Amino acid sequence: MRHGLAGRKLGVTASHRAAMFRNMAVALLKHEQITTTLPKAKELRPVAEKLITLGKRGGLHARRQAHALLRDDVIVAKLFDSLADRYKERQGGYTRVLKAGMRYGDAADMAVIELVDRDPAAKGQDSGPKPEVASDEDEAGEAAAA
């Protein structure tokens, strides 16, 4: 019997679920808005809310707890600097889940989860490392060496 068990399994193992929510939390805090399935968005909401509350609490212990979950120094710094300041007057309710229709391939319910009072400029930030652009000096050095 499954009486009183909280949370959804989402059809994956526990380790996969933990990794998935880690990745989704990092993406949400970086872009401040992501699109995913409705059950995943509903399960991600308390994770994100607790992370923002950790950021508001501040201190070394809270920073280490956030880093243990996120494992991304840049996102932890954003969480404790800009997001903590943005939500210092708000007592919870830092995210919203908006239904976004159905996915074409399998008709899964889709949703947009976003931070309340989000920064529109954060949407669509580059997800990967910056590609190195060869400068004129590098090209001249390579030509001379050849």
UniProtKB/Swiss-Prot annotation:
GO terms for biological process: translation. The keyword Ribosomal protein applies. GO terms for molecular function: structural constituent of ribosome. It comes from the Bacteria. InterPro entries: Ribosomal_bL17, Ribosomal_bL17_CS, Ribosomal_bL17_sf. Residues 134-146 have a biased composition (Acidic residues). The keyword Ribosomal protein applies. One of its GO terms (cellular component) is cytosolic large ribosomal subunit. PROSITE patterns: RIBOSOMAL_L17 (PS01167). Residues 118-146 are annotated as: Disordered. Gene3D superfamilies: Ribosomal protein L17. Keywords: Ribonucleoprotein, Ribosomal protein. HAMAP family: Ribosomal_bL17. NCBIfam families: L17. Belongs to the bacterial ribosomal protein bL17 family. This is Large ribosomal subunit protein bL17. It comes from Acidiphilium cryptum (strain JF-5).
